[in-house]
Amino acid sequence: MKTKKSYDKVTRWVTPPILMLIIIHIITGACSSNAYPIFAQKSYENPREATGRIVCANCHLAKKSVEVEVPQSVLPNSVFEAVVKIPYDTQIKQVLANGKKGGLNVGAVLILPEGFELAPPERISPEIKEKMGTLNFQNYSPSKKNIIVIGPIPGQKYQEILFPILSPDPANKKEIHFQKYPIYVGGNRGRGQIYPNGSKSNNTVYNASVTGRISQILRKEKGGYEVTIENISQGRSVIDIIPPGPELLVSEGEFVKADQPLTNNPNVGGFGQINAEIVLQDPSRIQGLLGFLASVVLAQIFLVLKKKQFEKVQLAEMEF
């Protein structure tokens, strides 16, 4: 009989930078337990696809919620807070790259309108700095300062991430206008299920590659399993490799069908995205509005005074 091992490999055409990132991810998985934003930065020029989908969802297959808080409107050349919330139960543990259990990390991507960018340190107030803590933000790329990423960072401490944002000034940038703009947000908790090269992580379910009977389950010395499936119709046996982490659901002698789960799905995290809107407000419009409101108030005051004066005249005429 022929023996075939069906497992995921990093193919030869993978570029050295991506290969290095994957190696780093495996080595440091115990402490950095969710996918790195740099994976998306290296693989995609823009993190938001034409369909509106943020590319982080290509590796983080489970859908989870995310929230964002931004002001309804901001003035030009001003610093404001954009708060991304990534809620999850901090009591749960996830499978790390070494197969052990550990806490979840979180990460986020904030896609701002053109012209909006991360506020420089000298423009950030002490109050905002105190709220931010020691967070380290970075631009998605040198040419995309309006896209900001962060992570992985400890989810236990940072379920709320405060981004200090500087609004643009149309007086200095002619392509910027006073209007309503969209903001796109992605937030993740936990590790991904797929690496950028398409191979599986150990944070996902593993299925049978063929239909047949399980003839042997070999527990590997460093964790994980080799599951041998006898495929009678094809006259061969196939060995499915299961890395440390997922829990085995099958036993020797059991008959399985192709694509039937051999393990549980250990993933407890997921990715979510949400949209928001913000208005870049013209200061002159605010001044005009204040002037209008002041005129309305004055008109009301004069109307009340006039009414009282008229009542006094009527009262005097009645007494006369």
Curated annotation (Swiss-Prot):
<keyword id="KW-0349">Heme</keyword>
<dbReference type="InterPro" id="IPR024058">
    <property type="entry name" value="Cyt-f_TM"/>
</dbReference>
<dbReference type="GO" id="GO:0009055">
    <property type="term" value="F:electron transfer activity"/>
</dbReference>
<keyword id="KW-0602">Photosynthesis</keyword>
<feature type="binding site" description="covalent">
    <location>
        <position position="59"/>
    </location>
    <ligand>
        <name>heme</name>
    </ligand>
</feature>
<dbReference type="GO" id="GO:0009535">
    <property type="term" value="C:chloroplast thylakoid membrane"/>
</dbReference>
<keyword id="KW-1133">Transmembrane helix</keyword>
<keyword id="KW-0472">Membrane</keyword>
<feature type="binding site" description="covalent">
    <location>
        <position position="56"/>
    </location>
    <ligand>
        <name>heme</name>
    </ligand>
</feature>
<dbReference type="Pfam" id="PF16639">
    <property type="entry name" value="Apocytochr_F_N"/>
</dbReference>
<feature type="signal peptide">
    <location>
        <begin position="1"/>
        <end position="32"/>
    </location>
</feature>
<keyword id="KW-0813">Transport</keyword>
<feature type="binding site" description="axial binding residue">
    <location>
        <position position="36"/>
    </location>
    <ligand>
        <name>heme</name>
    </ligand>
</feature>
<comment type="subunit">
    <text>The 4 large subunits of the cytochrome b6-f complex are cytochrome b6, subunit IV (17 kDa polypeptide, petD), cytochrome f and the Rieske protein, while the 4 small subunits are PetG, PetL, PetM and PetN. The complex functions as a dimer.</text>
</comment>
<feature type="binding site" description="axial binding residue">
    <location>
        <position position="60"/>
    </location>
    <ligand>
        <name>heme</name>
    </ligand>
</feature>
<keyword id="KW-0732">Signal</keyword>
<dbReference type="InterPro" id="IPR011054">
    <property type="entry name" value="Rudment_hybrid_motif"/>
</dbReference>
<dbReference type="Pfam" id="PF01333">
    <property type="entry name" value="Apocytochr_F_C"/>
</dbReference>
<feature type="transmembrane region" description="Helical">
    <location>
        <begin position="286"/>
        <end position="306"/>
    </location>
</feature>
<keyword id="KW-0479">Metal-binding</keyword>
<keyword id="KW-0793">Thylakoid</keyword>
<dbReference type="GO" id="GO:0015979">
    <property type="term" value="P:photosynthesis"/>
</dbReference>
<keyword id="KW-0812">Transmembrane</keyword>
<keyword id="KW-0150">Chloroplast</keyword>
<comment type="similarity">
    <text>Belongs to the cytochrome f family.</text>
</comment>
<protein>
    <recommendedName>
        <fullName>Cytochrome f</fullName>
    </recommendedName>
</protein>
<dbReference type="GO" id="GO:0005506">
    <property type="term" value="F:iron ion binding"/>
</dbReference>
<dbReference type="GO" id="GO:0020037">
    <property type="term" value="F:heme binding"/>
</dbReference>
<dbReference type="InterPro" id="IPR024094">
    <property type="entry name" value="Cyt_f_lg_dom"/>
</dbReference>
<keyword id="KW-0934">Plastid</keyword>
<dbReference type="InterPro" id="IPR002325">
    <property type="entry name" value="Cyt_f"/>
</dbReference>
<keyword id="KW-0408">Iron</keyword>
<dbReference type="InterPro" id="IPR036826">
    <property type="entry name" value="Cyt_f_lg_dom_sf"/>
</dbReference>
<keyword id="KW-0249">Electron transport</keyword>
<comment type="function">
    <text>Component of the cytochrome b6-f complex, which mediates electron transfer between photosystem II (PSII) and photosystem I (PSI), cyclic electron flow around PSI, and state transitions.</text>
</comment>
